[in-house]
Design a protein with these regions (language model features):
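Conserved beta-propeller blade repeats
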Residues: 76-86, 90, 122-135, 177-194, ...
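Asp-box/WD-like beta-propeller blade repeats and closely related beta-sheet repeat scaffolds
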Residues: 102-104, 114-161, 169-179
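Short, acidic Ser/Thr/Gly-rich low-complexity loop/linker segments typical of extracellular
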Residues: 70-74, 376-389
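Structural motif
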Residues: 58-60, 100-106, 146-161, 201-208, ...
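Sequence context surrounding c-type heme c attachment/ligation sites in exported
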Residues: 316-319, 388-475
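Multi-bladed beta-propeller domains
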Residues: 65-78, 109-124, 161-178, 211-227, ...
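Residue position within the beta-strands of beta-propeller blades
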Residues: 35-46, 90-94, 136-141, 191-195, ...
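C-type cytochrome heme c attachment motif
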Residues: 106, 137-138, 161, 190-194, ...
Length: 475
């Protein structure tokens, strides 16, 4: 029997369990709703961004019901990553029937404990999340780490998919040569995921969003610096995440993250917000300790912040992460996909001189498109003129990592995007500048390139040879 199995057998003497939520100095305590956690002898934060195993010694989902913790399902060698359906009746999870199996996606009906396999592939499929309109998404292990994919969830659709060109069937949502791992589905229908920054190149964890058809990828905020991961959206619309040793949030009025004054601890990320606004979260005292489920009331909610974290569930020698409340929740908006049935995409830049890193002083004369093939080799696909106001309009390859390079009149590099992004087949995208940040709006004017022509410069059939200058010029 492995360490996890032994720990769960002795669960009655190894558990610290506080079955109440709404903890305060008053007597009006509320019973905590049932919740699910992933229990593992070892949880390795951020292993997913290296394409590695987060639970190298196995894991098991526990259901905490009326103050008692027990395995959520039977007959599995390993289970993890619970996501409760919007009506609170079903649970998606990653599971292995035998230890040698890859992770696959399963669904549990809570009322009768019926389990069915939802997704089966040759490799690991992890972190499933429900999407509206009868679909789900997950992280698929690939040669480049994890990539996000989506598919029908197997239920009779209550609503048709809003654009047939984006489904049905299995649909890849990310197209970059680096791990992308989902963390939440936002209220507006976008998918929140973590990857490294710069995207496709860097090593600093960052939070990004993408629509349910794989279009519109962007970083959530552009105040890049410290690593942040484990993002979850609250009922208020704020997104809470962890730096590891601290918590912070993205809130609508601010273009940069807002620190959260939380008790000193290491936070795993992925909180669960109760109806009263309190948080169930996974935290530990330090690197040598194990994660436990704690309860905390942040100071910016209706209840005053607690002086310390209250332990709700702890198991000796076991990490407890990913709390998920078993309760109905608001269904996110469906994304009305605007993709066309094309094998290319159009991109309009309003002012390529603008950047979050500082505007380009020397006016760019042209822009070069670079694309990364399946082997990671960079090829230059051609150039397009940049207008005096910084605008350009191009037709680009779709569903592949791309980036732009600004050139002066002599063809020398003024600035190259540090990372990569993709644009979906049939997508028509407008950018304010080059990595300006979602908080920056465009000037109220017609871009000069559209006054000259409404035909995009075709950069889809450029040179296929590797770009010899890319390595020498640096990123």
């Amino acid at each position: 029997m492995n360490l996890l199995g032994r720990a769960l057998v002795v669960m009655p003497v190894a558990i610290t369990l506080l079955p109440l939520c709404g903890l305060s100095s008053h007597s009006d305590r509320n019973t905590c709703p049932d919740f699910i956690v992933t229990a593992a002898p070892v949880y390795t934060p951020l292993a997913e961004l290296q394409g590695q195993e987060r639970f190298p010694n196995g894991a098991q989902l526990l259901l905490v019901h009326e103050g008692k913790a027990e395995p959520l399902v039977q007959g599995f060698a390993a289970t993890a990553d619970a996501d409760v359906s919007f009506d609170g009746k079903l649970v998606l999870f990653a599971g292995k029937k035998s230890a040698s199996d890859p992770w696959q996606i399963w669904e549990l009906t809570l009322q009768d404990r019926y389990v069915r396999k939802v997704i089966e592939t040759a490799g690991d499929t992890e972190r499933p999340l429900y999407l509206p309109s009868g679909r789900l998404l997950w992280a698929q292990r690939t040669a480049y780490g994890f990539q996000i994919e989506s598919a029908d969830d197997g239920h009779l659709p209550r609503q048709v998919f809003l654009n047939p060109t984006a489904g049905p069937g299995i649909l890849p949502l990310t197209y970059v040569h680096a791990s992308a791992f989902p963390t939440d589905v936002l209220a507006d229908g976008r998918i929140l995921f973590e990857s490294n920054f710069p995207l496709g190149e860097g090593s600093t964890p960052e939070l990004y969003t993408v629509y349910a058809d794989g279009s519109g990828v962007e970083s959530y905020r552009c105040d890049h610096g410290r690593g942040r991961w484990g993002g979850t959206q609250l009922a208020s619309g704020d997104v809470v995440f962890t730096h590891g040793a601290s918590l912070a949030r993205f809130t609508s009025p601010l273009a940069q993250e807002d620190p959260i004054e939380a008790p000193a601890a290491e936070y795993a990320g992925g909180i669960a917000e109760t109806a009263s606004g309190e948080w169930l979260l996974s935290a530990r005292a330090g690197g040598g300790a194990h994660y436990a489920i704690r309860l905390w009331s942040p100071s910016f909610t209706s209840k005053p912040g607690a002086a310390k974290l209250e332990t709700v569930l702890a198991i000796t020698g076991i990490d407890l992460v990913e709390p998920a409340l078993i309760t109905p929740r608001t269904r996110p908006n469906r994304h009305p996909s605007g993709l066309h049935p094309w094998d290319y995409a159009n991109l309009l830049a309003l002012d390529a001189r603008l950047s979050h890193e500082g505007d380009v002083i020397t006016p760019p004369a042209s822009v070069r498109l670079e694309v990364q093939n399946e082997r990671g080799v960079v090829a230059a696909m051609g150039t397009a003129s940049v207008e005096r106001d910084g605008s350009f309009f191009v037709k680009v390859p779709a569903d592949a990592p791309i980036r732009f390079v600004l050139l002066d009149e002599k063809g020398s590099v003024l600035r190259r995007e540090k990372g990569w992004f993709w644009i979906r087949k049939g997508e028509q995208r407008i950018c304010v500048g080059c990595h300006t940040g979602p908080e920056r709006a465009s000037e109220n004017r017609v871009p000069a390139v559209l006054l000259r022509t409404t035909v995009a410069v075709d950069l889809t059939a450029g040179a296929t040879r590797p770009n010899a200058n890319a390595a020498a010029e640096g990123n």
